[in-house]
């Protein structure tokens, strides 16, 4: 009888998601935000995403053996709750709460999950809910999905889970062993988030903007070492400045921030607006440099011996999306291969919790080869959505879609690209993307003007054929998920300038045809036309919105922007007066 496990995340009041394993195979996974059209879906439960997973598998709630959740009760007899209370002594209400009522959030979350499951048709008397510690779920999402057979070092860094903020361990023969954890407020991810807020961005959304701003600054201009240290095996955040709660927080316009007024006294007012200007570009560079330095020191201390032995590292948690750190990690002599869970944030813990429970029950999970795990739609679905849409889109079904789209792109036009199953995780990887020809001068600016309106200093990224990668990027390392940056060779910097960042790197997706044949074939056509089998690729959404899920979402976005071309499966939609390239057949 098949072992069916539904993973549900959402305990930390953001990024709820669902994932479904049947006999170790990941059948479906999706974030709630995509269905409810609310980025991060804060304070929601994963109802729509769980419903999709069940429908995708063609099963009923009664077919599910276990519901795995990535949040667990933490014992009073361990270190975590006492560490929290000691370090937050200046907020006695929080400190006492950690000691006396330290699992209140877990109980509240579990009750909400039960309610959500009841709405889905689960029998509350028969539901088997299995909690997995948050950082164990992150660890499982990295290690168990990596496909590594050797002893594997495991790293988890995020803001925080129940109390833990950082996880060091190893996986061997399918079992995860914990070496060390750090606890709130000693959180490298929390510190990065605090500086993200100081630099004028939102936590959860803005960290990658700080990373993108950093190459424009000079880290040597400001010494951020007072903010955090790693000595004698312990990470300590200076809570005079950051990772603060209660009355210690800096407040502005009724909002409390994760840093203190003392940070303002030291660095000046928090940044406002979209311009990458001084001194803030230097602050971004200094934060990124400190983050990399401390993370690499911690890896050395706790995982160095394992890496020297086997060279395999699995990494998850929100900070695993810091591609500049990942570039430094794979440059280490003792790292042969780094697997970064593509959904490294909290959404990925639905996969991790389910994978952990599957292994615990004796059913190993398959290697995660791709992220095309969400809904897909047929040409008929697309045509029906066009017929119902208020904007009355003009559409045509086209032959040889990859060839026509490549020609449209080569002429400098961005294209909204909607093909196959939606991606799981924050990266658009050729399922729900806005694409452009990276050798067409100004295409990045056109994408910004037509839809993205993003800060121009933020880089656009390339997808490329697996045959192109050895020529364009200098490191031979698997890169299917845009979780690494690579140095771009000098020749290719001039061939595809629209996807090369200020520091000469690109955050690349290297695609094998078997996982997304239509996207691959389109890039092959680009290669025929331009000599470059590379596409500019950014997520299919407007600024501040969740990535597109359905044809209706795509049409709403298309007619709410200045984009001229939308391809959904074989259905091409163009704006009035725009050349549909019908002469190509």
Predicted segments, located by residue:
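Short beta-strand-loop/turn "lid" adjacent to the catalytic site in phosphate-handling enzymes
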Residues: 56, 60-114, 140-141
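Short acidic-aromatic active-site loops that bind/stabilize oxyanions
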Residues: 99-107, 129-132, 273-293, 512, ...
């Amino acid at each position: 009888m098949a072992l069916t496990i539904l993973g549900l995340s959402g305990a930390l009041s953001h990024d709820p998601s669902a994932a479904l394993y049947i006999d170790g195979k990941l059948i479906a996974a999706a974030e709630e935000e995509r269905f409810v059209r609310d980025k991060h879906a804060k304070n929601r439960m994963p109802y729509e995403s769980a419903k999709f997973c069940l429908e995708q598998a063609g099963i009923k709630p009664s077919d599910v053996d276990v519901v795995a959740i990535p949040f667990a009760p933490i014992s009073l007899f361990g270190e975590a709750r006492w560490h929290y209370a000691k370090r937050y002594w200046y907020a006695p209400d929080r400190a006492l709460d950690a000691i006396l009522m330290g699992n209140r959030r877990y109980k509240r979350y579990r009750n909400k999950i039960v309610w959500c499951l009841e709405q889905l048709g689960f029998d509350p008397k028969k539901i088997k809910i299995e909690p997995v510690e948050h950082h164990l779920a992150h660890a499982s999402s990295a290690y168990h999905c990596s496909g590594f057979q050797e002893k594997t070092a495991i790293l988890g860094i995020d803001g925080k889970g129940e109390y833990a903020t950082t996880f060091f361990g190893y996986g061997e023969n399918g079992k995860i062993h914990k070496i060390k954890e750090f606890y709130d407020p000693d959180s490298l991810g929390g510190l990065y988030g605090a500086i993200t807020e100081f630099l004028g961005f939102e936590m959860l959304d803005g960290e990658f903007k700080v990373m993108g701003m950093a190459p424009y600054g000079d880290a040597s201009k400001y010494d951020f070492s007072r903010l955090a240290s790693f000595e004698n095996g312990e990470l300590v955040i200076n809570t005079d400045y950051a990772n603060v709660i209660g009355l210690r927080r800096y407040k502005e316009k009724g909002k409390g921030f994760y840093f203190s007024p003392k940070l303002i006294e030291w660095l000046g007012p928090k940044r406002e607006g979209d311009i990458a200007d001084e001194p803030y570009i230097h602050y971004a560079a200094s934060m990124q440099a400190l983050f990399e330095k401390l993370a690499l020191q911690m890896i050395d201390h706790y995982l160095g011996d394992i890496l020297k032995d086997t060279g395999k590292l699995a990494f998850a948690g929100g900070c695993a999306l810091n591609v500049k750190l990942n570039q430094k990690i794979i440059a280490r002599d003792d790292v042969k291969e780094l697997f970064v869970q593509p959904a490294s944030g909290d959404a990925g813990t639905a996969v991790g919790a389910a994978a952990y429970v599957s292994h615990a029950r004796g059913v190993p999970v398959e290697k995660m080869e791709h992220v095309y795990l969400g809904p897909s739609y047929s040409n008929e679905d697309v045509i029906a959505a066009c017929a119902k849409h208020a904007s009355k889109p003009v559409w045509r079904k086209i032959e040889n879609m990859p060839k026509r789209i490549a020609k449209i792109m080569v002429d400098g036009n961005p294209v909204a690209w909607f093909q196959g199953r939606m991606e799981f995780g924050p990266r658009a990887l050729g399922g729900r993307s806005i694409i452009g020809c990276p050798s067409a001068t100004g295409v990045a600016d056109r994408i910004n003007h037509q839809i993205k309106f993003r800060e121009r200093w933020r880089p656009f990224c390339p997808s490329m054929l697996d045959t192109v990668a050895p020529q364009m990027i200098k490191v031979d390392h698997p890169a299917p998920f845009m979780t690494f940056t690579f140095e771009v060779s000098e020749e290719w910097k001039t061939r595809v300038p629209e996807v090369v960042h200020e520091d000469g790197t690109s955050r690349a997706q290297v695609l094998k045809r078997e996982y997304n044949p239509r996207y691959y074939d389109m890039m092959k056509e680009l290669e025929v036309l331009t000599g470059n089998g590379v596409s500019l690729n950014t997520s299919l959404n407007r600024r501040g919105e969740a990535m597109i899920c359905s044809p209706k979402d795509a049409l709403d976005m298309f007619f709410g922007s200045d984009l001229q071309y939308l391809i959904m499966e074989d259905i091409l939609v163009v704006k009035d007066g725009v050349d549909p390239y019908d002469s190509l057949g």
